[in-house]
Amino acid sequence: MLDIQNLSKTFNPGTVNEKKALSSLSLHLDEGDFVTIVGSNGAGKSTLFNAIAGSFYADEGSISLAGKDITFMPEHERSRRIGRLFQDPLRGTAPSMTIEENLALAYLRAAHGNPFSRISKKDKDFFAEQLKQLGMGLEDRMKNPVGLLSGGQRQALTLLMASLKKPKLLLLDEHTAALDPATAEKVLALTKSIVAEKKITCLMVTHNMHQLSLIHI
């Protein structure tokens, strides 16, 4: 499913600020795998995710996803195949748009490659059904702006948006690090449930051993 071979990335090469973030890294995930990478801040975890997502190109090595070489595929094309959650709950959603509009944008983009298509009543009912599974009452607030939600609610919504249409790969980049412990545990439980139910191939990074134990028990 995901195959990375000899990936290397150096920032500011040839200067006093040169930093080798990745060095000949190889990694393989089979379809349906849930793999967690544990490392301290600055260990290159987010650099790896940025390389996979296409935020920049690696200096050396190759990346393939579902049998397709994506090493030099533009970021916007990769985003149709790869879902991603960030540490900051404010990323991944549009605060001035409603919950329903955010879900529609994610759904139409993933399903049709066109975020400006129309959504049907059937689609709206599907959104409400999916929101209900989060157990946060968001199905009754679909007309509310996302900016009114708490950090935990926004992160749960982003998780749902990333998985409405099953992605080839889901990247979880310290996605509970900014949440309080109780909320983080709830979002992790939702993550584990959604990933297992939809059999999503998933790569998560964290520096928190407790969160690692929660997701893999």
Question: Can you say where each PLM-predicted feature lies in the sequence?
Answer:
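ABC ATPase NBD coupling module
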Residues: T15, D69-G83, R91, G113-S120
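Conserved small/polar residues in nucleotide/adenosyl-binding loops
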Residues: H216-I217
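Helix-to-loop junction immediately C-terminal to a conserved catalytic motif
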Residues: A53
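The feature captures the beta-strand-to-loop junction immediately N-terminal to the Walker
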Residues: V38-S40
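H-loop/switch region of ABC-family ATPase nucleotide-binding domains
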Residues: T206-H207
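A short, flexible loop at the N-terminus of ABC-type nucleotide-binding domains that lies
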Residues: M1, T10-S24, P74
